Each structure stands twice: as structure tokens, then as C-alpha cells.
């Protein structure tokens, strides 16, 4: 358990500033003589350091449920308590100190977001578990983008031909609605995927939508480039500056420099991203000049998830509980509100781009080409 004399250094490492940087040491001092709460922090920190799941287990008790608002500080302290071990892991991997600072500054970014949205100091349990990726040295901030070491979950299969063209094919058993998006409640068709000596047969995925008609891809022309558990880097986009082409290209370039040096045994085949803003229907909603659409255009899109509450609170803020309460201050808020009022729905989406496609115009190292 961290001591009071260590807290200042950890606050700086997590880029925690303002009132929360004053409240957290006070909370730590208050629990010095409370063995139950100190032990609870140790247990939570242990789970963040060593659990192989990326969200709270079903039997997890939220700190805020039994501590009230102090539970958010309790969560934040549980994260900071892991940092000495997390820093040791970075040192063992020879991660440059600048990248370590960039990566763990995300704690301050999320704490600031939570204070802005909820008016509370600390972190919710949901946000706390996001940091398992940072703490376990699986996510790194490299400029505008973050990259998470994540084998592909296998929502689709990626085929390439001799000319370097890429095609996405839906995995077997996906329940799809009439629009080609996922729909477990009212499916119109379920995908079939077959492979054999002659080739691959399945439902193409075009611009994020699963096609109802199957197609055959002969093996002498096409091969499997990415399937379930194939090594990829998962892109996350933290809040911050503009999502420009140049900033994305710079981050991709840095990823090509960093990961082969520090994770040489993870020969990733490309990049993926699964997010609320990759909803393929945003083409109907947003301006063609939107950076979100420009980002999505660099990926081969596929459906991911169904109706997305995350998309709603990401656009309108966590305080908006209904469309009637939703603010309409930004162009995106106005456009999405009008879309929802006309009967539209929000979902999530995914996208993938192979190294051979030169993401954002950046050529990969030769060792990472298929």
C-alpha cells in the first residue's frame, strides 16, 4: 500500500491536478488507521494488476455503492497504488520514459473528464477498469492515438488477394437485420461461413454492413490474412486535440517504431478499432468534412455491437439521460439529435486496416508485411 510520502510523486506521474490532487492525499490520510479499507484497496489493485478480464467481474462490488462519493477517490487510489509495479514493468520492457509519462497521463485525463461530467472527484468503477490495459503494459499512448495489444476477437475474417486487395467476410452465426447490422432480437438472416480446399464462402461485409447474399472466394486467388486471435493493435482515441490525418499518421509511424522493438514476439498484422463513432450510419448524419468520417474512411468497417448507449453519452455527455435532456450545442450534437428524433438509432462499429494497406500512408517495417 502506498504511503503518504509517496503520493505527491504518483499524482505527478498520473498528471492529476487541481482539487482532486488535494482531496486524494486527504482521503489516503483518513484511511491510514482503517485496515478494512486499506485491505480493500490492496485487493482492487491486485485485480487491476493481474486480472485477465477487461471489465469488472459480475461479483465486483462498486466502491461508490458502499462509500458514496468517497468511493470514487477509493477507486482512483486503487489505480495509483498499482503504479510502482506498473513502472517496474515499463522499465523491464525498456519503455522510454516519455512514453511512460504519455501513457499514465491518461489517468489525469479521465479524472478530469469524470469531474466535468459528474461533478465528482475520482473515477467510477467502469473507468477504473479501463486502466487494466495501461497497468498491465498492454496499452501505450503514442501521440494522438493509443494502441492496445489485443488479438483480434474474430468478428469478421479478412481475406487478401494477390493484388493486395482486402475483403471482409462475416464469421459464422451472426444475426443480422434487414440493414445488415447486428440484430439478435429481430434477425432477418444468420451468416454462414464455410472454408475448404477450394476456397472460402461467406457473407461479404461492405462499408460496415453484412450482405445477405453469400459469395465464393477461390483459394488460388484469396488467402486468410486475419482471423480470430490473430495479432493486431487496437486503436483507442483519447479525448484531446483534433483527429487530423497528420496526427494519426504520426502515431502510426511511432507504433511501427515502438512495438517491434519492445514486443518483438508480437508480429501484429495491422490495426483495428471498435468504437461508438464507427457506426456506419454516421455517413447519413455527419458532414463529409467530419474528422470522424475521415478516420473511418481509413478502415475496412464491420458491424460491432447493437444499440449503443455509449454512443449517446459520448455525444451528449453522461448527464444526459434522455433525448429531451440532451444538449444541442455542437454541430455533432445537433446532427445526432435530429437523426434520433427522426427515428434513427445509434450502434457501434469496428474497423480494420492491414499493414499491407499502408495505414494513413505509412509504410510498415518489412518484418510486419504478410
Spans of features found by a protein language model:
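Non-catalytic substrate-recognition and accessory regions of acyl/acetyltransferase enzymes
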Residues: 1-243, 263-270, 286-370
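Short acidic, S/G/P-rich loop/turn micro-motifs used as interaction or catalytic elements
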Residues: 239-246, 277-281
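Conserved acetyl-CoA-binding loop-helix of GNAT-fold acetyltransferases
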Residues: 243-260
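General N-terminal targeting signals
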Residues: 250-254, 285-290
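Extended, charge-biased low-complexity segments
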Residues: 270-272, 279, 284
Amino acid at each position: 500500500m502506498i504511503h503518504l510520502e509517496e503520493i505527491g510523486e504518483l499524482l505527478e506521474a498520473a498528471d492529476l491536478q487541481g482539487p482532486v490532487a488535494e482531496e486524494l492525499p486527504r482521503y489516503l490520510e483518513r484511511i491510514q488507521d482503517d485496515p478494512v479499507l486499506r485491505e480493500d484497496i490492496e485487493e482492487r489493485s491486485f485485480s487491476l494488476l493481474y486480472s485477465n478480464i477487461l471489465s469488472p467481474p459480475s461479483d465486483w462490488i462498486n466502491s461508490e455503492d458502499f462509500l458514496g462519493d468517497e468511493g470514487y477517490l477509493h477507486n482512483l487510489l486503487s489505480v495509483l497504488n498499482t503504479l510502482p509495479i506498473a513502472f517496474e514493468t515499463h522499465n523491464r520492457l525498456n519503455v522510454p520514459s516519455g512514453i511512460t509519462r504519455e501513457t499514465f497521463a491518461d489517468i489525469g485525463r479521465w479524472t478530469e473528464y469524470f469531474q466535468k461530467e459528474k461533478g465528482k472527484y475520482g473515477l467510477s468503477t467502469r473507468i477504473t477498469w479501463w486502466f487494466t490495459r495501461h497497468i498491465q503494459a498492454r496499452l501505450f499512448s503514442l501521440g494522438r492515438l493509443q494502441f492496445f495489444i489485443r488479438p483480434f476477437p474474430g468478428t469478421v475474417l479478412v481475406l487478401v488477394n494477390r493484388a493486395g486487395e482486402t475483403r471482409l467476410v462475416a464469421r459464422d452465426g451472426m444475426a443480422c437485420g434487414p440493414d445488415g447490422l447486428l440484430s439478435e432480437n429481430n434477425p432477418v438472416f444468420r451468416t454462414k461461413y464455410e472454408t475448404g480446399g477450394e476456397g472460402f464462402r461467406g457473407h461479404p461485409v461492405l462499408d460496415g454492413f453484412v450482405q445477405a447474399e453469400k459469395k465464393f472466394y477461390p483459394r488460388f486467388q484469396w488467402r486468410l490474412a486475419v482471423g480470430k486471435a490473430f495479432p493486431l493493435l487496437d486503436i483507442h482515441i483519447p479525448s484531446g486535440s483534433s483527429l487530423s490525418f497528420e496526427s494519426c499518421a504520426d502515431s502510426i509511424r511511432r507504433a511501427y517504431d515502438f512495438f517491434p522493438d519492445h514486443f518483438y514476439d508480437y508480429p501484429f498484422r495491422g490495426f483495428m478499432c471498435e468504437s461508438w463513432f464507427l457506426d456506419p450510419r454516421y455517413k447519413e448524419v455527419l458532414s463529409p468534412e467530419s474528422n470522424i468520417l475521415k478516420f473511418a474512411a481509413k478502415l475496412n468497417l464491420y458491424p460491432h455491437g447493437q444499440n449503443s448507449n455509449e454512443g449517446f453519452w459520448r455525444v451528449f455527455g453522461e448527464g444526459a439521460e434522455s433525448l429531451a435532456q440532451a444538449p444541442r450545442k455542437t454541430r455533432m450534437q445537433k446532427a445526432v439529435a435530429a437523426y434520433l428524433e427522426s427515428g434513427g438509432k445509434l450502434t457501434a462499429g469496428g474497423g480494420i486496416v492491414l499493414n499491407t494497406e499502408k495505414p494513413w500512408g505509412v509504410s510498415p517495417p518489412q518484418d510486419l508485411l504478410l
